[in-house]
């Protein structure tokens, strides 16, 4: 591809459209990372090499904590601008729900951005224990999820310790528990109520909002709750209105519709006498994983400023119309804060190339299917390409049927495949996406004629949403982008599971069933980056085939370059076996017994013992040595 350029590389992998300025390509063909808008760009391959020199192994999760601060700052700036645009004086707090990524390096980095404009959310007792320690003095903590007395008591203790904890009532039964514990501790609770909106944002997570939502009160339940509360000493404690429109909302109109409905609840509760000082709109702010800037479920058709404006404007108008004091706006946009900051790097372990096909020598006793396929191949440059492929499919299917019925032997069966794939390659060379009639056949051929790149990672551990909900993540080779990719491939992981594959790829501002990739060079490692994996993936990852957590590093970038600020070793085999109930002492004893029973020479026995011990304490993934 003689016209290949760095701009062509950027376009092929849609980098400008999903990277949001944090990732680019340099003159050496390396993916570079720029954590701060005005800061230096660092080569991702160089960072990985430095991490490996320090002892890290592939697959490797690379975190850039500076991006976390940048994302939070952009979100706060967008709301500051929207409040100025709409003359809104209520203020704004960006709350981080730590369920998105509970790792100390993530939640702690965000929590270090002290100030009234940041808070934390917990949805369980372990999460609450973390945020009680992470929160700044006087910090906002939103307490969601199912609650028992202990959870409620811990949240109320947070109030006693000077934290601004709000216990959000999401089930009618929770209110009495909160009031009983508040009286027992002699503390005035901060109460919130979660409304179940009828409006919801379309998408993969749409049932987290709307009438089918797992949490939240109906209008009747909210009225009953207020009646139970208004005549108590805690009537003025109901200060937070919470709702959730959905996660990863693709269409900005869904946000506007949800806010229109939610604002009505704020007005009505205020009219009834509730002192609503905070409106928590939940999550919903999406990430453009695809780079298509569309209403597709893995994309968004809006930006930060549009999102903020659609939140602020309805509340500003309602407060002005009804003479209400503007409440403090709270969002829980954890995905938008964290997705960009982490990249998974994994090496290709093997490539299975697509069949090239060939034309076998002719024989007088050839079955009819082979004769017909040979005739089709001879006419590749003469007849319409689509018509030729359709005929080839027919005779290929006839040949497969004949083999299954025992009418032809294995040699003939192999020749049928050889001819079919030779025809397929010849047909594809004549097709063009510019011709509408060619596109269905070209799509089919691109799916058939692809290489399988076996990559040293687990889909289920590192990008589980790919398997669970067909989530799309940008995938890019982290080097050689100054070379034209000559192959098309699909990515398969190391698990013994046919679902351990990536089926959808970001390419040229669209989606495809395969990805342009380079052929492997002997002795060189070919490393692939999985981007925007900082939200949910680590936390949701499972241990299929006992592949565990990967090695991870945190990289700090400043004006002088970068440094590996922190390194965490991934799971080893003994850790995974212990997790699923194996007694390590028993395993070691069994190995020793079997070595002894083999009656080997002492030196050989020691070699086997050392190899088994190394296997037991080693990384769960494959060696990351270059192929060839």
UniProtKB/Swiss-Prot annotation:
Protein name: Biosynthetic arginine decarboxylase
Modification sites for N6-(pyridoxal phosphate)lysine: 99
Gene source species: Xanthomonas campestris pv. campestris (strain ATCC 33913 / DSM 3586 / NCPPB 528 / LMG 568 / P 25)
Family: Belongs to the Orn/Lys/Arg decarboxylase class-II family. SpeA subfamily.
UniProt cross-references to SUPFAM superfamilies, sorted A to Z: Alanine racemase C-terminal domain-like, PLP-binding barrel
Keyword Cell membrane: no
Enzyme class, UniProt record, top EC level: lyase
EC number, UniProt record: 4.1.1.19
Catalytic activities: L-arginine + H(+) = agmatine + CO2
